[in-house]
Amino acid sequence: MSLGSLAFTLFLTVVAGIKCNGTEVCAGSPGIPGTPGNHGLPGRDGRDGIKGDPGPPGPMGPPGGMPGLPGRDGLPGAPGAPGEHGDKGEPGERGLPGFPAYLDEELQTASYEIKHQILQTMGVLSLQGSMLSVGDKVFSTNGQSVNFDTIREMCTRAGGHIAAPRNPEENEAIASITKKYNTYPYLGVIEGQTPGDFHYLDGASVNYTNWYPGEPRGRGKEKCVEMYTDGKWNDKGCLQYRLAICEF
């Protein structure tokens, strides 16, 4: 069918569906609904409404967390200015009366006599070879032979220390007692952690030595020091029995 014939057929179909009344007003049948149009542009905002009444109170919220720990103390402040001098105190109580002058003289006399007796005793002991005085030191022995720790304890109990010569004069005094008893004594000198490093019992470094040639050679195994009768030193173990000589 040609395009013109198709158009004519559709025209007849439409005309056939039209009804006319006596006044020449024709009413056609409803056509097929068209496709929906596109959405229009948004309208303008309306005016604000009237303010509403306040709402009811809300429920109580949960309690907050626990209190935190106290903070650290702050730094000390600067020292304050010195205060004013206080008032003078009341006089103290009267002291005890002093000794009469004659008693003071008697005390001086007694002190002199005691010193004289001590010097006499020291002289007797020196003649016996059991005690010698050199400078401000006194070297003494009781003639016993014991190990190093026992000698140290004996001397400490007597208020002294194991004899430790710090110069040739003191070394000779100890050697004199050694010859008298013909027994080697221990000296107040010991070896430290480092082999060959010797020091006095108070920790001070040794400032005087009189080693026998080739000594010390214990190399850390002989911690104590003994003296020969000629005054020479030798490193030795500390468990031997040696003459106890103390210094005061």
UniProtKB/Swiss-Prot annotation:
Chain ranges of the Collagen-like domain: 28-100
Residue ranges of the region described as Disordered: 28-100
Mutagenesis or variant effect for residue 208 to H: Knockin homozygous mice develop progressive pulmonary fibrosis. The mutant protein is not secreted in bronchoalveolar fluid from mutant mice
Native organism: Mus musculus (Mouse)
Keywords from the UniProt entry: Calcium, Collagen, Disulfide bond, Extracellular matrix, Gaseous exchange, Glycoprotein, Hydroxylation, Lectin, Metal-binding, Repeat, Secreted, Signal, Surface film
UniProt-recorded name of the protein: Pulmonary surfactant-associated protein A
Residues found modified as 4-hydroxyproline: 30, 33, 36, 42, 54, 57, 63, 67, 70, 76
Biased composition (Low complexity): 69-82
Subunit composition and interactions: Oligomeric complex of 6 set of homotrimers.
Chain's role: In presence of calcium ions, it binds to surfactant phospholipids and contributes to lower the surface tension at the air-liquid interface in the alveoli of the mammalian lung and is essential for normal respiration. Enhances the expression of MYO18A/SP-R210 on alveolar macrophages.
GO MF annotation list: carbohydrate binding; metal ion binding
InterPro entries documented for this protein: C-type_lectin-like (IPR001304), C-type_lectin-like/link_sf (IPR016186), C-type_lectin_CS (IPR018378), CLec_Tetranectin-domain (IPR051663), Collectin_CTLD (IPR033990), CTDL_fold (IPR016187)
Main location per the UniProt record: secreted
Bias (Pro residues) ranges: 54-65
GO CC term (a single one): extracellular region
GO annotation (BP), single: respiratory gaseous exchange by respiratory system
Disulphide bridges: 155-246, 224-238
UniProt feature, compositional bias: Basic and acidic residues: 42-51, 84-93
Underlying gene: Sftpa1
Domain C-type lectin: 132-248
